[in-house]
């Protein structure tokens, strides 16, 4: 695993962000897409109005967490996921944002299962999310 300071460019959705990564010595990787490792949030770009509502709530919560700056990304395997995104855990100060999204029921644990396998968990989360 590798650890880098980074600056938020934009929140794409509840489990994906774009950041500029500080490699040190004044070297930066600009506008890198990060997929938050080990979590899945409802889709914010979908024709399912109910899922979209919860997906947008997850995106909004992610934005609230990251507005403070002082971000750090801990990458996993220094590799990219199936859609070409860097996989990592995002921290603000010492708070693991991946874990907080699950704790607050905006996300479920995800380790390669199919969408069908985690659909029930997403439905259960809807009962606990304040929108």
Where are these regions (language model features)?
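Small beta-barrel nucleic-acid-binding modules, primarily SNase/OB-fold domains
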Residues: 1-131
């Amino acid at each position: 695993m590798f650890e880098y300071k980074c600056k938020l460019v934009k929140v794409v959705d509840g489990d994906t962000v774009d950041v500029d990564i500080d490699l040190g010595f004044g070297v930066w990787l600009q506008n890198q897409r990060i997929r938050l490792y080990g979590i899945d949030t409802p889709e914010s770009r979908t024709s399912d109005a109910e899922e979209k509502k919860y997906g947008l709530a997850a995106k909004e919560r992610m934005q609230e967490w990251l507005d403070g700056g002082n971000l750090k990304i801990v990458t996993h395997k220094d590799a990219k996921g199936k859609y070409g995104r860097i996989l990592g855990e995002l921290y603000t100060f010492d708070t693991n944002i991946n874990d907080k999204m699950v704790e607050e029921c905006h996300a479920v644990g995800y380790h390669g299962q199919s969408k069908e396998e985690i659909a029930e968990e997403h439905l259960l989360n809807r009962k606990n999310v304040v929108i």
